[in-house]
């Protein structure tokens, strides 16, 4: 029989954006669910898959050559689908978000989480609010 700590840890899923400072291998090894940011090179959009489709060095080389490059956040709908897939399994979500001082992703995640909490009342007791507070401990400019 698992001890109490193991049972508690199995009741939630860690979640993050592809902006997290971890490799895809580490994320997958620890069962962390992730949602990708977007980026463009010369008008062609890609999902951030940890540099597998286009290595990060190629993105930066394109910038250096003068290509039109930009990044964009995960939108509310993408966060909603990401969170819904986890909540549908009966799991709570501990999501670590990109800083609200650098991206609108935090706000999009909050909006999606609110909808998920309304649709999955059991999620009211989850760790999501705590995780969202964690990202505010260190200001983006500091």
Name each region found by the language model.
Residues 13-78:
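N-terminal glycine-rich anion-binding loop in soluble enzyme alpha/beta folds
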Residues 10, 29-32, 120-125:
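A short helix-to-beta-strand connector/capping loop
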Residues 8-10, 89:
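Residue-level preference for short coil/turn positions at secondary-structure junctions
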Residues 1-8:
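Short, Lys/Arg-enriched N-terminal segments with co-localized hydrophobic residues
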Residues 53-60, 83, 88, 115:
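A short glycine/small-residue-enriched secondary-structure motif
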Residues 21-22, 102-104:
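Short, active-site-adjacent cap segments at secondary-structure transitions
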Residues 75-86, 111-113:
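Short, charged beta->alpha transition segments
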Residues 89, 94, 98, 104-142:
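Active-site histidine-anchored catalytic micro-motif
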């Amino acid at each position: 029989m698992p001890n109490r700590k193991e049972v508690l840890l199995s009741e939630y899923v860690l979640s993050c954006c592809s902006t997290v400072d971890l490799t895809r291998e580490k994320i997958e090894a620890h069962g962390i669910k992730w949602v990708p940011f977007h980026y463009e090179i010369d008008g062609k959009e890609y999902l951030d898959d940890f540099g597998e489709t286009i290595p990060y060095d190629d993105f930066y080389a394109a910038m250096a050559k003068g290509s039109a490059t930009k990044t964009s956040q995960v939108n509310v709908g993408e966060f909603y689908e990401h969170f819904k897939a986890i909540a549908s399994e009966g799991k709570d979500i501990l999501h670590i978000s990109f800083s609200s001082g650098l991206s609108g992703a935090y706000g999009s995640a909050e909006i999606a989480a609110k909808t998920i909490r309304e649709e999955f009342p059991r999620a009211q007791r989850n760790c999501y609010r705590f995780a969202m507070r964690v990202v505010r401990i260190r200001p983006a400019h500091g």
